């Protein structure tokens, strides 16, 4: 647990509540003090959904601290069962309320004696894991609970469907373009002649979970959420899984070939090579674009990539392998899974950055001065400050990255969206000069605050005025070189004279 100005992955209870609110007719109750209960507001603001967020906060206040939580938590569970009639109620503490060290499992047992709904306590260590790890574990816990329940009741469907079928695991609320990706994956499966058995947790009910073993295989499109569930189903039912993210032309083809191998091992006798060839040549514009003059203009340009494991690794490979862009460094904030990330991006970038500190990321961007950034909402802010364009490719994200229109990142339509994102993220040709001539920049003033909080330099008004006269496409570089020169010389205030001295010294 730490106090942070910005977090890439939220605390564990956010992951648990993302899973609970993704299912249909499941209610989440968080045992939390005021301040930890922002999930409802965040989801209501960001997700383009008509329904209210099915989450209730059982507030830890002074009365609870004096008397204990049992009465309040149990009453809230029973009240929500009566009001909402959910199939399942998931109780989760937050990292703050976990400090109380209360026996919440006992509260759940007490409440379940008086409820029609099943009641589960999220089996998550709130001190040790983040949002993504908690979401992965909570999904596995719910699946395991209902598989075991169906097995006891004799309603578990274990016989495979007559034709090839798939479970798509890991599509959640507040996921990066998850709903668009899900639609694209369903279309891809239909094109391959594969029936979608279940999509979980998004839009599924807990009663559907007993049908999970009927699918021929599981597809886990995201590294972060769904892996534990797929491993559980493989252990219990020998159900194979495909864990290749179909993002970009090469990886989409690799994913389809892996699916082909899984199906043929079960006697399906399918061959998808003609489909891959046709999609790559005629449907996806990415392969054609990568050979066009527009893409050749990007060859050798420098870029940096930062995000979760899934999107940062896939984007690094697309930029380097499919578009010839030089990835100076690629990074992830998923420190718990760093070895997988290093192996994935090996050979596709010069350096690897593993951190969840946004100031380290910002300083790394400023150090290499790339032509474009591909990252999260935070890297977008960094890009604004450094006058470097940024394409957002991973959560955490703000409202503009929950588009109403169709914007998948996976599959063959996803490759087209990625081409547009990459191409439009670079400042091209005369664009910057035209913006200088005709206006259109967000601001004419140079933001002179450093990226790190401990910036020790100030610019005089005359120095800033002189800096503003420099064309925009090199202004950022001149500014950084001047500040570097000033630090080396022990100068704390940058004047016009310092600017010119730096220019002579470093050729800025």
UniProtKB/Swiss-Prot annotation:
Which prosthetic group or cofactor does it need?
[4Fe-4S] cluster
Q: Where does [4Fe-4S] cluster bind?
A: 36
Task: Tell me how the cofactor is bound.
Answer: Binds 1 [4Fe-4S] cluster per heterodimer. The cluster is bound at the heterodimer interface by residues from both subunits.
Q: Which HAMAP family match?
A: ChlB_BchB
Q: What is this protein called?
A: Light-independent protochlorophyllide reductase subunit B
Q: Please name the pathway.
A: Porphyrin-containing compound metabolism; chlorophyll biosynthesis (light-independent)
| Catalytic activity, reaction form | chlorophyllide a + oxidized 2[4Fe-4S]-[ferredoxin] + 2 ADP + 2 phosphate = protochlorophyllide a + reduced 2[4Fe-4S]-[ferredoxin] + 2 ATP + 2 H2O
Which one of the record's GO molecular function terms can you name?
Answer: ATP binding
Task: Establish whether keyword Hydrolase is in the entry.
Answer: no
Q: Name one Pfam family in it.
A: Oxidored_nitro
Key word Iron present: yes
User: What family does the entry list?
Assistant: Belongs to the ChlB/BchB/BchZ family.
Entry keyword set? 4Fe-4S, ATP-binding, Chlorophyll biosynthesis, Iron, Iron-sulfur, Metal-binding, Nucleotide-binding, Oxidoreductase, Photosynthesis
Taxonomic path = Bacteria, Bacillati, Cyanobacteriota, Cyanophyceae, Acaryochloridales
Which CDD domains does this chain map to? Pchlide_reductase_B
Q: What class of enzyme is it?
A: oxidoreductase
Origin organism is Thermosynechococcus vestitus (strain NIES-2133 / IAM M-273 / BP-1)
Q: Which InterPro entries match?
A: ChlB/BchB/BchZ, LI-POR_suB-like_C, Nase/OxRdtase_comp1, P-CP_red_C, Protochl_reductB, Protochlorophyllide_Rdtase
Functional summary from the UniProt entry: Component of the dark-operative protochlorophyllide reductase (DPOR) that uses Mg-ATP and reduced ferredoxin to reduce ring D of protochlorophyllide (Pchlide) to form chlorophyllide a (Chlide). This reaction is light-independent. The NB-protein (ChlN-ChlB) is the catalytic component of the complex.
Q: What is its EC number?
A: 1.3.7.7
Q: Name the active site residues.
A: 294
Subunit: Protochlorophyllide reductase is composed of three subunits; ChlL, ChlN and ChlB. Forms a heterotetramer of two ChlB and two ChlN subunits.
Binding positions for substrate? 429-430
Please give the SUPFAM superfamilies that the UniProt record associates with this protein.
Answer: Helical backbone' metal receptor (SSF53807)
């Amino acid at each position: 647990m730490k106090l942070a100005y910005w977090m890439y992955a939220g605390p564990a209870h956010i992951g648990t509540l993302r899973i609970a609110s993704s299912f249909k007719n499941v209610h989440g109750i968080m045992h939390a003090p005021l301040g930890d209960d922002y999930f409802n507001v965040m989801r209501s603001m960001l997700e383009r959904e008509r329904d209210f967020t099915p989450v209730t906060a059982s507030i830890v206040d002074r009365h609870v601290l004096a008397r204990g939580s049992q009465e309040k938590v149990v009453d809230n569970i029973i009240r929500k069962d009566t009001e909402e009639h959910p199939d399942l109620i998931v109780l989760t503490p937050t990292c703050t309320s976990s400090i109380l060290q209360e026996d919440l499992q006992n509260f759940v047992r007490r409440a379940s004696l008086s409820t029609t709904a099943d009641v589960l306590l999220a089996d998550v260590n709130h001190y040790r894991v983040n949002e993504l790890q908690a979401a992965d574990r909570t999904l596995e816990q719910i699946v395991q609970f209902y598989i075991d329940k169906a097995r006891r009741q004799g309603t578990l469907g274990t016989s495979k469907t007559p034709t090839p079928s798939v479970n798509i695991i890991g599509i959640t609320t507040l996921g990066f373009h998850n709903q668009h990706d899900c639609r694209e994956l369903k279309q891809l499966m239909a094109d391959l002649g594969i029936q979608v058995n279940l999509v979980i947790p998004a839009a599924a009910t807990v009663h559907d979970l007993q049908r999970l073993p009927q699918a021929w295989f599981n597809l886990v499109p995201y590294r972060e959420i769904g892996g534990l569930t797929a491993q559980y189903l493989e252990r219990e039912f020998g159900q194979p899984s495909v864990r290749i993210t179909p993002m970009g032309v090469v990886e989409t083809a690799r994913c389809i070939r892996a699916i082909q191998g899984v199906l043929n091992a079960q006697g399906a006798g399918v061959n998808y090579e003609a489909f891959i060839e046709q999609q790559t040549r005629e449907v996806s514009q990415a392969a054609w674009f990568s050979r066009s003059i527009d893409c050749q203009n990007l060859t050798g340009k420098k870029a940096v990539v930062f995000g979760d494991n899934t999107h940062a690794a896939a984007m690094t490979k697309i930029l380097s392998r499919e578009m010839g862009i030089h990835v100076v460094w690629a990074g992830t904030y998923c420190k718990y899974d760093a070895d997988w990330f290093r192996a994935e991006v090996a050979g596709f970038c010069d350096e690897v950055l593993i951190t969840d500190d946004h100031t380290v990321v910002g300083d790394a961007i400023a150090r290499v001065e790339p032509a474009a950034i591909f990252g999260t909402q935070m890297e977008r802010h960094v890009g604004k400050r450094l006058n470097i364009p940024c394409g957002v490719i991973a959560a955490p994200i703000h409202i503009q990255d929950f588009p109403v229109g169709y914007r998948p990142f996976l599959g063959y339509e996803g490759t087209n969206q990625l081409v547009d994102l990459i191409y439009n993220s670079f400042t091209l040709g005369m664009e910057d000069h035209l913006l200088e001539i005709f206006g259109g920049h967000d601001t004419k003033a140079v933001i002179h605050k450093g990226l790190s909080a401990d910036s020790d330099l100030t610019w005089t008004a005359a120095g800033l005025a002189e800096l503003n006269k420099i064309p925009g496409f090199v202004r950022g570089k001149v500014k950084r070189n001047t500040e570097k020169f000033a630090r080396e010389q022990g100068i704390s205030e940058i004047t016009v004279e310092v600017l010119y001295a730096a220019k002579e010294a470093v050729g800025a």
